Structures are given as structure tokens and as C-alpha cells.
Amino acid sequence: MAKGKDVRITVILECTSCVRNGVNKVSTGISRYITQKNRHNTPNRLELRKFCPYCYKHTIHGEIKK
């Protein structure tokens, strides 16, 4: 039996360098990824290194609120 319900939630990861630069003149948007995380294993905000097609490099993508 499961201990609790809604343990695994859907989160949105957003590129931190696009947001910090205020969407610089070269980039045309902000990269976002949708993934899931287990709330019991990772209670704090999730940060993953993913590819940003607007920055043309791998950057840190942080979890944002919905």
C-alpha cells in the first residue's frame, strides 16, 4: 500500500541564464522543461543541467512555481 497520495508531482524547469539576462537580444524566448519529482526524496527545489536551445548551451534549469 502507498503511504501517502500525490507523492510524485509534476514540476516545470526554467532556464536560469535566460531569465537572469532578461531574455537578451540574441535569444527569442525562455527554455522550459516539464518533469516529475518525488516529494519525499527531494523536498527542496530541483535544479538540473539541461540544454537551452535559446542560449545554445547547457545551463542550469531551476524549478518554478505554477
From Swiss-Prot:
Disulfide bonds: none annotated. The keyword Protein biosynthesis does not apply. It holds the Pfam family Ribosomal_L33. This is Large ribosomal subunit protein bL33c. InterPro entries: Ribosomal_bL33, Ribosomal_bL33_CS, Ribosomal_bL33_sf, Ribosomal_zn-bd. The gene is rpl33. One of its GO terms (cellular component) is chloroplast. GO terms for biological process: translation. It is found in: Plastid, Chloroplast. HAMAP family: Ribosomal_bL33. Belongs to the bacterial ribosomal protein bL33 family. It comes from the Eukaryota. Its main location: plastid. Keywords: Chloroplast, Plastid, Ribonucleoprotein, Ribosomal protein. GO terms for molecular function: structural constituent of ribosome.
